[in-house]
């Protein structure tokens, strides 16, 4: 990231344009990173889900609904009462929501939306702001089925990621408003 900023500054490029150009790639990279989370089973998964796949989506592979994270290095109990964590810290049974897979799919969709919007949206800064909104909304809702600590803020329960996601959405919406207002002002000047 720093090298991109340094290069852009050295070449006199507008940072807003650089951020807009980077937004689709950031979302794509996030999705690729989540593939690693899914494959490694590193504890970045959802809550226990030992339910049968609903008939309406039974055409999908079972692992898209409920996944057995064989590499449960966190030793999280995935919902089988009385099942011990192995002495090596791994748990070899129990299924969970495959949230890294869901995030991969959403990240690729968002990256596609940002990529195909880049030529239609002419206002600098709006693509970056859209990235913040879409990524924040995606992360907020995926946290609803993920294992994480909740914090009590102003009487509301939220995970750290949800708090950050709300901030991303707020800053993204403010950014869209600001950049469009700025472009209109410059157009009339």
Model-identified regions with their sequence ranges:
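A feature for loop-to-transmembrane-helix boundaries and adjacent hydrophobic helices
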Residues: 1-189
